Amino acid sequence: MADEQQFIEDGLQRTQIDEFFAEELGRAGYGGMDVAKTPMGTQIVLKAEKPGMVIGKGGKNIRKITTELEDRFNLDDPQVDVQEVDEPDLNARIVADRLANALERGWYFRKAGHTTIDRIMESGALGAEIVLSGKVTGARSRVEKFNRGYVKHNGEPAEEIVDSGVGVAVMKLGTIGVRVKIIPPNAELPDDFEIYEDVDVEDYVADTDGESVEELLEGEPEDSETAEELDEDVAAGADDDSEADEEFVDEEIVEEDVEVPTDDDVEDVDVDELEEAVDEELDEDVEAEAEELMDEMDEEGDDE
């Protein structure tokens, strides 16, 4: 059988056993059960307001219940342990059954609801809620709620902290569902906090291997030493950065291939020869201009 199917079968069997106990032990104040399967058999812990009625005279009733569990639910060697409920008014299952019985006996629903929730709060509960749904007073179905204190309705606290119980009152006009939620007195809610006034902080300081605060402070370095170490670290980091920059520049110079002319490649040029060449070019230009002027003057003389 697959794990999912086995999980469903175990939950269904647990619900059927719970309904069986509720029918058989209703007058004894049945308050719930815990089932645990062990190698030695199935361990069942019953919670009841009147354990004597569950056990019976000479254990007759408990033997009958054990035989019924083996036959109806195929449990291997069931071992039933009965525990008495310390405070019945804080058990949601017992309170729901009591309220349902009161409604069946003819109590007015509002009186029964207020009386029940007042008893719950007087027992020390942090909060309680009672919901009656069905044909409470007339032919039409409706819902009536009674609240006291603080009750969580969702999240993990609603599943782990809040105690829930359900009962059914069979009336002439129809059934009335009874749902009860109770937060016990010792519940630790996630939003609880305490404020201490005029408290010495040293009383709440945790000891570290028996060492005092002064001994712990002696082992710590002074501020001046710490500052010097920081300066040394900064200087070392700056040197490392400069070396890294130099290496990077050298790599760039090596990568770039630049041709630089050397002294051997440059030809030796005589300055005097350059000056003579310039003078010769100037003399030739001057002579050419002089000849042009003489020709123009001769042409003007001939015209006259």
Swiss-Prot record:
Any one GO cellular component localisation term in the record: cytosolic small ribosomal subunit
GO biological process: translation
GO molecular function: rRNA binding; structural constituent of ribosome
Top-level taxonomic group: Archaea
Domain (KH type-2) ranges: 17-86
Region described as Disordered: 216-304
SMART domains, per the entry: KH
Keyword RNA-binding appears in the UniProt entry: yes
Keyword terms, alphabetized: Ribonucleoprotein, Ribosomal protein, RNA-binding, rRNA-binding
Family membership noted in the UniProt record: Belongs to the universal ribosomal protein uS3 family.
Function statement: Binds the lower part of the 30S subunit head.
HAMAP family: Ribosomal_uS3_A
NCBIfam families assigned to the protein according to its UniProt record, in alphabetical order: PRK04191.1, uS3_euk_arch
Quaternary context: Part of the 30S ribosomal subunit.
Protein name, entry field: Small ribosomal subunit protein uS3
Gene name of the record: rps3
